[in-house]
């Protein structure tokens, strides 16, 4: 009776897909270009794509006129194509690939949920993924990771489809199995062209460890590793070999070692402790992390072995990626995005059964605790947000009130609905709160803080003063990408040492330089420091930047 009654609140499968698509379009695409590209990644990636288009070199990428070997080209090709279709390198055009592949990733999650459990589980899981904090944010930002997550998820979907087709089905399914297993390798190849070796390491590790745990040796033999990896290499090397031939040994060393092996083993950027993700991931997967422990416990407790295999696949998927990046020296929260579909599916299955079956033990022992925790967090956050804003940014207090009302009101509404045991309404209330909060933040708050985050404003100061033939330099670790993009100046001279800066400012002609205010302040006390003119001072991201000139 419970399942029959609750099934009426869910639409048909094709309607579920359309609802997910429409939901993501509103959440990710509407007013996507309302704020500028923000440091450090967005304007740099946009500049790489623009130099590809302007230089008509789609093989060897450049930024600031120099060879760029940090990332493979696929994401930059997509930005270039998007900018061509949108009529220029606007914020919307540059972010469009991330929004597109974020949306497609939500739809892939729906299909995996449908494959493993039911279309209803897939529908709920898609909503969970779309409204998780980090996934939603990266789907509206010109970062590579939403695109990478799509291709790794597509690869694993093909693997799962191939594996399930191979269980107890006749030879009539062989062509479909072949198509699925080769789709697995094609997905890995495209993921590799998006972000390097991690694109094939993650799906391959997940699939092999899953088969190893199941002791399915025949499955490993049927994976067509030789022909599949040959197809993978053909796709990847069709770009990489010409790029190495053009870039030479230096490009080979940079792409093969510095940004892969060295970055993983030595962590020359973003070095963090091994336990970093244990406290970072829960924040990134809010609000759904509250229900993840219950989802894992519920998955272990299920009695049907075939259903356990589905849960095991999701557990291996998420666990392997979590462990892989935890062992890396360099860590960022965005690196874990490829595991978000897996944990969303776990939580989606929990919620599907929670609202449709009698899970008395889990309702009271696990989910009740998670719900009260979420209610408490929402209530505290709703009270704290306006208080913090009033203390530090008093003029912005009115803009914090809608978020405060949303959090406090949502918390109280959850409590009332929980009292009446309307669990489906609680789920959709959480979805609505997250969607409303994210939409308000990205469409109201982001444009509001844009003048303090964007490099465009100080770049306008440069463009209004610099004349043809005059040079622009940048001192210390500030990257050139944002200023290349917003000034259109290529190249910008990179000054790493004080001696370089001093020599630059002593040029006979007029020159301009960007540097941090703290560096400018300390350099003024140096003996022999030339007289310079302070032209502008602005906040760019978290940096206090000044523009100076020697004339």
Protein language model annotation of sequence segments:
Residues 2-3, 14, 182, 186, ...:
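Membrane-embedded architecture of ER/inner-membrane glycosylation machinery
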Residues 1-364, 484, 537-538, 543-544:
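Membrane-integral, polyisoprenol-dependent glycosyltransferases
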